[in-house]
Amino acid sequence: MERARRRGGGGGRGRGGKNVGGSGLSKSRLYPQAQHSHYPHYAASATPNQAGGAAEIQELASKRVDIQKKRFYLDVKQSSRGRFLKIAEVWIGRGRQDNIRKSKLTLSLSVAAELKDCLGDFIEHYAHLGLKGHRQEHGHSKEQGSRRRQKHSAPSPPVSVGSEEHPHSVLKTDYIERDNRKYYLDLKENQRGRFLRIRQTMMRGTGMIGYFGHSLGQEQTIVLPAQGMIEFRDALVQLIEDYGEGDIEERRGGDDDPLELPEGTSFRVDNKRFYFDVGSNKYGIFLKVSEVRPPYRNTITVPFKAWTRFGENFIKYEEEMRKICNSHKEKRMDGRKASGEEQECLD
């Protein structure tokens, strides 16, 4: 039995490789076979669910992204409550005998759209950090070369004191909150490199059931190597473009036509650039205002119902400040005139 299982698992892995065509990004409707072959524990846990209610959850599309030693499977599924995205992270060891580790993350397509926007911010921040890190690494290599030329009695420590005290330094953090769930995004760095951790937590309650039919158990976490954030984001964008509109229409009731939103705009002031982007989700329309000064980015989201008050307050403070500036200018001019008249009298 044990040999038969191993042979079946090996054959499944081979078929999974053929289905995806060996590319880092793939799309296949035969994905459940490849999925079960890569991590059979997932298939074993899903089999009772499928036997009890195979018609409850329908798989619409799937993509696979390979980043270093990890594989990320992005599955768009549909249940009676709507469409959702299931992300599975699979880590495969060097040899066949190594254990296969996996983790997963489940989120609605509306949250996936916000995750896509957040990934854009993290990608931009990571790009600036990369430039900084390259300069620091170049300078650090020079320091190491000079140290090697010097003779010391005691060997140098393998890592710096700062890295020992802070093995995981946080470079950027953000979060998304929806219903009874929170999604924390943390860009971190350790000795192995930089990575993005996406962690989902759920607020528990008596007899509460998760949105996608799962009980509210432990938190879900995936870890994405920073080098693959762009490829992961691109796969997410394509799935949202293909299947996200249906989810939004279902939440609206399917009767209203999608609203045409104004185009975004931006302008530069000194060394800062301000972006104005109008978006919408199941909670309504909002304005996303971003202040960008590399490598920093600050963003606020203003709901549509508060736009009028925001505009009124902006105009109010602009008028008051203009009056204050004009009054100050007039006082300075009067002071100069008075000093000039006094000088004429003295002459």
Curated annotation (Swiss-Prot):
SMART domains attached to this UniProt entry: PUR (SM00712)
Organism of derivation: Homo sapiens (Human)
Ranges for region Disordered: 1-34, 133-169
Regions that span the bilayer: none
Phosphoprotein as UniProt keyword: yes
Protein name, per record: Purine-rich element-binding protein gamma
Any one annotated GO CC term: nucleus
GO BP: any one term: regulation of transcription by RNA polymerase II
Biased composition (Basic and acidic residues): 134-146
Residue ranges: DNA binding: 51-293
